[in-house]
């Protein structure tokens, strides 16, 4: 739904969620359902949680559900001017989106774009960017997107993603 509404590739959203939250296992994602490491600066009026990241006790956005984190991520990319250039890319061009996110400063890891692309390719998430992507993904990968529990148990080559980036600071 976010891909149709915002034009953000589903594969990018999923890969960022996987990478930033360590497949939903990071302390931040468990404590606050924050699967994208988005900090609570500027005019954030929602719930907050404090977590040591680049500095001690940084403020992060907290969400009532995982779905709310994904919705806020889409709105965050859509409303932050530094990401405007990304929307010139096709929602099926995950490689340009990955490079563009890195260039716009989403993460500090020098290989952030490559890590996103590796996750997308290893997990076949690019299938989600196609028409009827959920059905196509389920038929080709043997997994349903709506039932992600245990998704990566068969992804033995998947690296530990939590080391890939630092949290997203809306002021940078």
Language-model regions, residue ranges each:
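Catalytic cores of secreted/periplasmic lytic hydrolases that degrade extracellular macromolecules
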Residues: 1-169
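LysM (lysin motif) carbohydrate-binding repeats in extracellular/periplasmic proteins that recognize
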Residues: 172
